[in-house]
Amino acid sequence: QQAAELNNPSIAQAVARIDAARAASGATNGNMLPTINGSASQSRNNGNDGSDIVRRSRLGTIDASWEIDLWGALRAGRRASDAQLTARTMEWHAARTSIAAEVAQTYVAYRACQAQSAALQSDVVSREETARLTDLLVHAGFSAPAEGYLTDASAATGRQQQIASAAECDLNIKSLVALTGLSEPETRDVLTKNAAIQPRAPEFTLTALPIDTISQRPDVAAAERTLAAASAQINVAQAARLPRLALLGNISFFGIQLSGDSPQANGKSWSFGPSLSLPIFDAGQRAAQADIAKANYAEALANYKQVVVSAVKEVESTLITLNAAQKRLRDAHTAKDKFDKYFNASLARQRFGSASLLELEDARRNKLSAEQNLINLKREYTTSWIALYKAVGGSWLTQTQQS
């Protein structure tokens, strides 16, 4: 998971968006403070009367301005930028949660594939042993050639199923390589070292969750903060249609000297006072900007509602899948146990001649199907817990325990 967070492009994009939002927030906060600028110049020129008099002049100026936030536009802009920064941070958390869940689900799929492959390999050994014994009986004249064909075909079927399962396991490894950014040898080494760590889901039943768990989802929090930013932008746009008041100040230092030994004339001047800007005519531009801000708010509100509805649906659907898988697991364990016993009994009967090969192969298919079904259900149950972790936004257990 750590490797996935370090190397995943989605997380890198989320980090870049956070940096951009943080810079924008800093720029907006700076608008509430005075600005001070300085300038300096020096010039030298000759007179136009043909004389040799050279005039040198120097000028230095310091300008200061401070906009008075009469209508709260600057404060609204700061709220909007802060909300956008929080929204981008929540999107980063959402990306991390999504990547963690995807890595976990792929890891579970790989371990389940390993279990399937092991079961199929054991089945292949059993099929090949049956084929070997049947061939001996056929050559000795105690069994019909058709029975040899059947067992050989059964062994071939088992081998191709095992090969397909091994290929699926390799595909899961390829997915982990893409998710984590590790090389394939590194990924295989990590999986081999942690082979004893098998995914295990909790055993308790969960039928409902507090509604507060929805609000802690990063995507819901991001949508809510985006809505807050859009609301603040309406205040900014409306305030732009009102008069603006600023305090302006200026200090200038100058010096003039003629060529020769003439003295240098120095001086300074200053000014300070308010400046009032009145929007008189702009061909409806400011009104249009206010309408745009309102439309953006309506869009953000609709998106927030959609995100919340989708979040509720995702949590409820995951709970249904989780509880159904948990109930099915009990019967799957029973089915596997009984089909194992049935196959062993059929194998013993077939070797004593009281059961046909068709009965044995039917028992084998049922045994393998029950074992594969149990493995798939275990994977489904575990991945349902992972999906629930993602659906409620990640570390919901800690928050629930704290409450």
Indicate where each model-derived feature is located.
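Bacterial Sec-pathway N-terminal export signals of envelope proteins
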Residues: 1-24, 142-144, 198-228, 279-280, ...
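Amphipathic alpha-helical coiled-coil segments
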Residues: 11-14, 21, 81, 88, ...
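Sec/SRP-type N-terminal targeting helices
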Residues: 12-13, 29-30, 68-96, 122, ...
